[in-house]
């Protein structure tokens, strides 16, 4: 048991070491004062992997505040040239060990502490970079004395040993050997943090420092002391008006490289009073290691700061202003703020495949997932963890998934939300000819549709068809589903065409609908038929969508009757999409835009079988291929695509009485089976430099939509009909886990 020794705030006690640093920790108040949090520590990996050089009285390597091997025996040394070290780099004064612990001590403090305005809970983290390694360069003797030649040699040796940051809690001097040492160490990539001094005067009484290189100035920081209330410590030097002079035209005031950090009543070991003795230390010697440890954290989190030598500048730029507004001769840049330093500085940007830099804030939505590609969830996932860079070239993860949008399936009671029973009215003419027509004006009631046909809502729609006695068909329309016209021309049966409406979206027809359409059906010898059809998208409704694809398709079909009941057909379709790709929509001006038009071809196989005069079976299956498309933004292009769709329907045109009709259908809308998108994305190398490359992202949807529909229609009285329908959709838009059900009814009366 240790007895407390009251001697100038010195006391003895046992400390508990920490096995590791992770999860939520409690931090000493002088650490939270400068913005250290769990998120900062975890982002910096607690400073792991970097070396801190401590140029001082040495460091007691076996002190319980350090982890085993944390103070490097092979890299540390006695760097003094004016005296002989009695015990190598080991500390025989206590100052150097305290400084090293403040910057990078591994162990937490086991007891509660309340002194000097700081109240620390038991078990608090009390060091800035606990997992950093330490290089001790002993340059001061047991009395704490040494010469500039000793200090300059220690700085050089720390740099040669690989120190990323060198802490010098020693009176600053501007002698030639000190300047040469600073130039030498910074040329090797080290940052140097120098205590501002404890004489309560301007640094060097306003004298300049001559002979530093411009690179050295950018890697050099001075640190003054504040108390727990951010007031200037009574003993602390100030930057004054002196300058770091590179040449007659390049000069930087001390205040421009000056930061403030806590330096009063800082808890640290006092190894000269006992192996478990602690003291509350005060001085800019304590402020400097707070900044040194912070530089270690920054360079551990972002190696690019070490590569570019910009960590010190970042701390200056993100400091909290104290005293007079702006940089001043008392507080310099102000209080170091690690919370701010760990946030993006300046605009976050990314570089497109075209080599141009783009601000993340300027990127807007440019891709609407739909059709066979579903929601493009894999691409969205990649974009949700996209890498962007701030003005210090640091990598940050940003979420760009909102650049892709998609419709969501929602349960609905809207009456007849799909094309159920939208067959035209057929009028039989003398001589065996027929005339069919249909027209309506859609209301502005957007409903979920796989291919976005709701975009054309509140538009006049119509369709007219003439069938001659020899079987020739001619049709034209606006806004009507081209599937009906093509299947009618191919099979010469209204019931087949009518049932095919419920199987809409299983092929390329659905990607070019809503605008003008036309079809021709021609009888061939032996009862065979030839069908030609063309359709295009219409003008989008600006109230519903600001962006849509312009597409047109041409289809050629051939059918053969194997018996009066069985007919089979095959159709070739060519689809051209502008600002579209397999039903998805993009803006060519956006970062997710593709270049040029996309071209698709498809084969559709269909078969109708009449079970009886009133009962019909219809099966459809389509396969399609889409050519690859290039891009030059965040996307580098799309590979060739393959997709499939199928549907099966049954209809009874006279279930209980004449004129009623019942239909059952199941379909899988067109779905991508193979294809990928190239995403231009960055990773960082070991030095922190961005390395851009194309990442192939599969576009095959994670779900498979299946639609089940039951529809019934019956006449009620003269010119009155009742239509009922229920539809269940599984994995709507091929999005796994998104299901909906629609139930509705329509009573219609014609006058």
Region spans (language model):
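Substrate-binding/access-modulating region of protease and related hydrolase catalytic domains
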Residues: 26, 41-48, 121, 136-219, ...
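C-terminal subdomain of the subtilisin-like protease fold in secreted/lumenal serine endopeptidases
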Residues: 33-40, 156, 165-167, 222, ...
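Outer membrane beta-barrel translocator domains of Type V secretion systems
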Residues: 403-606
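Residues on the lipid-exposed face of transmembrane beta-strands in outer-membrane beta-barrel proteins
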Residues: 462-466, 518-522, 556-560, 605-609, ...
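Outer membrane beta-barrel transmembrane domains
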Residues: 495-510, 531-533, 546-548, 569-597, ...
């Amino acid at each position: 048991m240790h007895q407390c020794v009251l001697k100038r705030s010195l006391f003895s006690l046992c400390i508990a070491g920490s096995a590791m640093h992770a999860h939520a920790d409690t931090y000493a108040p002088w650490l939270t004062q400068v913005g250290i949090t769990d998120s900062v520590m975890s982002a910096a990996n607690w400073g792991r992997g970097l070396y801190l050089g401590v140029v001082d009285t040495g460091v007691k390597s076996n002190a319980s505040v350090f982890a085993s091997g944390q103070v490097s025996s092979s890299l540390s040394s006695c760097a003094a040239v004016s005296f002989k070290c009695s015990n190598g780099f080991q500390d025989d004064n206590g100052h150097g060990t305290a400084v090293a612990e403040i910057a990078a001590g591994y162990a937490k403090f086991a007891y509660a502490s309340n002194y000097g305005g700081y109240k620390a809970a038991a078990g608090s983290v009390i060091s800035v970079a606990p997992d950093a390694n330490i290089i001790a360069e002993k340059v001061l003797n047991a009395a704490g004395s040494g010469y500039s030649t000793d200090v300059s040699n220690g700085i050089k040796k720390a740099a040669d040993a690989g120190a990323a940051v060198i802490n010098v809690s020693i009176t600053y001097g501007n002698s030639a050997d000190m300047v040469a040492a600073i130039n030498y160490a910074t040329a090797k990539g080290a940052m140097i943090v120098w205590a501002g001094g404890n004489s309560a005067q301007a640094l060097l009484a306003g004298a300049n420092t001559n002979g530093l290189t411009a690179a050295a100035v950018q890697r050099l920081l001075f640190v003054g002391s504040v108390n727990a209330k951010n007031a200037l410590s009574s003993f602390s030097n100030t930057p004054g008006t002196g300058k770091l002079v590179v040449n007659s035209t390049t000069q930087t005031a001390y205040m421009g490289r000056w930061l403030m950090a806590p330096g009063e009543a800082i808890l640290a070991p006092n190894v000269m009073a006992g192996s478990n003795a602690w003291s509350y230390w005060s001085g800019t010697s304590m402020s400097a290691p707070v900044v040194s440890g912070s530089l270690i954290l920054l360079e551990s989190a972002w190696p690019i700061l070490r590569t570019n030598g910009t960590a010190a500048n970042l701390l200056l730029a993100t400091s909290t202003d104290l005293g007079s507004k702006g940089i001043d001769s008392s507080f310099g840049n102000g209080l170091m703020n690690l919370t701010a330093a760990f946030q993006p500085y300046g605009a976050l940007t990314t570089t497109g495949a075209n080599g141009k830099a783009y601000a993340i804030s300027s990127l807007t939505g440019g891709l609407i997932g739909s059709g066979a590609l579903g929601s493009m969830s894999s691409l969205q996932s990649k974009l949700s963890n996209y890498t962007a860079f701030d003005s210090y070239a640091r990598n940050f993860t940003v979420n760009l998934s909102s650049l892709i949008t998609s419709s969501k399936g929602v349960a609905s009671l809207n009456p007849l939300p799909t094309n159920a029973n939208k067959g035209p009215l057929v009028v039989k003419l003398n001589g065996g000819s027929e005339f069919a027509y249909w027209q309506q004006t859609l209301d502005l009631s957007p409903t979920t549709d796989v291919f976005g046909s709701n975009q054309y809502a509140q538009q006049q729609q119509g369709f007219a068809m003439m069938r001659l006695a020899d079987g020739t068909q001619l049709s034209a329309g606006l806004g009507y589903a081209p599937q009906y016209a093509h299947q009618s021309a191919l099979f010469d049966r209204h019931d087949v065409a009518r049932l095919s409406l419920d199987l809409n979206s299983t092929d390329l027809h659905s990607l070019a609908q809503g605008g003008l359409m036309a079809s021709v059906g021609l009888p061939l010898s032996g009862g065979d038929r030839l069908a030609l059809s063309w359709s295009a998208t219409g003008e989008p409704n600006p109230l519903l969508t600001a962006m849509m694809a312009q597409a047109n398709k041409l289809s050629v079909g051939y059918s053969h009757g194997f018996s009066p009941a069985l007919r089979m057909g095959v159709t070739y379709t060519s689809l051209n999409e502008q600002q579209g790709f397999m039903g998805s929509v993009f803006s060519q001006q956006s970062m997710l835009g593709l270049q040029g038009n996309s071209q698709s071809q498809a084969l559709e196989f269909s078969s109708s079988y009449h079970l009886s005069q009133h009962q019909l079976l219809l099966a459809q299956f389509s396969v399609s291929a889409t050519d690859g498309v290039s891009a030059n933004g965040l996307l580098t292009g799309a590979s060739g695509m393959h997709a499939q769709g199928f549907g099966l329907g049954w209809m009874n045109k006279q279930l209980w009485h004449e004129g009623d009709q019942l239909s059952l259908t199941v379909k899988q809308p067109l779905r991508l089976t193979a294809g990928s998108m190239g995403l231009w994305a960055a990773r960082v190398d070991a030095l922190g430099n961005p390395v851009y490359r194309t990442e192939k992202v599969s576009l095959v949807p994670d779900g498979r939509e299946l639609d089940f529909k039951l529809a019934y229609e019956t006449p009620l009285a003269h010119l009155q009909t009742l239509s009922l329908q229920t539809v269940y959709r599984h994995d709507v838009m091929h999005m796994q886990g998104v299901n909906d059900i629609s139930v509705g009814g329509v009573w219609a009366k014609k006058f």
